[in-house]
């Protein structure tokens, strides 16, 4: 039995892709409260003795203030991602930016630790390897919101850790196939052709289990107040596809100019975190599902 003091942790967006993997590996001494509005539906989330579920919206200020006061730390995962931001501009601003500001202020007022999930997409396009001191260059609404969120937290919180997460992949109870590597692997199971758009763009990648482990470590080490790149190795997108399948078609694509390599030396040194998963180990987790269903694609949901 784990005899460490019980830690109460609030997880926003905890019924989502990263959140459910985090909950699957919850430390024995943690009791989690999940707040999630389960956009798009989710039949795979199951509360337990150590996991309390609150179906609610992070824009509800009185609810958020109450939940934050009841917990020791907050892991802030909730947000509108990717193409859903320009498709739902009003909600994206209120959820990604305005609600994040309130959460940061409530955490600071109550003396709670805040762990925020940002994205390496804030680097946009950069031919040099980016570290945490590299000037952000957001090229879309989502990454711009994350830059704003980071700045808000640094301005309003005394006890925080910001992760800039790389391109995430891996199996989750709340699966997503609007993530490129996941779609590549799933299509390979069905023996289908993989379309690679461009392919010469660089991406730092991170398995969702490794990301979840970093979140746990960020809460446990409450002395570390900084920004960390949460990434494993850097890959060209075409090279990633070739690791997964031989059935590849390269498609000319100019709508996404992002390309960035990212240095992870700070997280290795400061948090003592190490990634353990890779593309090959991820492939064994996948199962054949109807990957074209709307539930697997956040951008198909209406948030307004």
Regions inferred by a protein language model and the residue ranges of each:
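C-terminal substrate-binding subdomain of Rossmann-fold SDR/epimerase-dehydratase oxidoreductases
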Residues: 192, 197-304
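Conserved Rossmann-fold NAD(P)-dependent oxidoreductase catalytic core, especially the SDR/UDP-sugar
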Residues: 101-141
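NAD(P)H-binding glycine-rich loop region in Rossmannoid oxidoreductase-like domains
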Residues: 58-95
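N-terminal Rossmann NAD(P)H-binding glycine-rich loop of SDR-like oxidoreductase domains
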Residues: 9-28
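Active-site helix of classical SDR
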Residues: 145
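Flexible, glycine-rich beta-alpha linker
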Residues: 123-124, 140, 163-179
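Conserved beta-loop-beta element that borders a ligand/cofactor-binding pocket
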Residues: 119, 150-172
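NAD(P)-cofactor binding segment of oxidoreductase domains
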Residues: 74, 87-114
């Amino acid at each position: 039995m784990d005899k460490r003091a019980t830690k109460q942790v609030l997880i926003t967006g905890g019924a989502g892709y990263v959140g459910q993997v985090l909950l699957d590996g919850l430390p024995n001494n943690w009791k989690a409260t999940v707040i999630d509005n389960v956009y798009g539906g989710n039949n795979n989330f199951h509360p337990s003795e150590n996991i309390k579920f609150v179906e609610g919206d992070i824009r509800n200020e009185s609810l958020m203030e109450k939940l934050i006061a009841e917990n020791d730390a907050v892991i802030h995962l909730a947000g509108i991602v990717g193409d859903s931001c320009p498709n739902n501009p009003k909600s994206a601003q209120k959820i990604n930016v305005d609600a994040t500001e309130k959460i940061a202020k409530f955490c600071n007022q109550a003396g709670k630790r805040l762990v925020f999930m940002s994205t390496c997409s804030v680097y946009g396009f950069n031919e040099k390897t980016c570290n945490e001191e590299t000037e952000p260059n957001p090229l879309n609404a989502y990454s711009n919101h994350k830059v704003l969120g980071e700045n808000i937290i640094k301005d309003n919180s005394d006890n925080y850790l910001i992760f800039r997460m790389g391109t995430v992949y891996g199996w989750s109870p709340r699966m997503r196939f609007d993530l490129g590597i996941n779609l590549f692997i799933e299509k390979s199971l069905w023996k289908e052709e993989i379309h690679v758009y461009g392919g010469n763009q660089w991406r730092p990648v991170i398995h969702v289990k490794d990301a979840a482990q970093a979140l746990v470590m960020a809460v446990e080490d409450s002395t570390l107040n900084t920004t960390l790149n949460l990434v494993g190795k850097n890959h060209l997108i075409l090279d990633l596809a070739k690791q997964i399948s031989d059935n590849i078609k390269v498609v000319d694509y100019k709508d996404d100019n992002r390309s960035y390599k990212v240095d992870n030396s700070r997280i290795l040194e400061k948090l003592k975190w190490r990634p353990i998963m890779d593309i090959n180990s991820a492939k064994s987790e996948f199962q054949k599902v109807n990957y074209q269903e709307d539930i697997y694609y956040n951008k198909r949901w209406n948030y307004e």
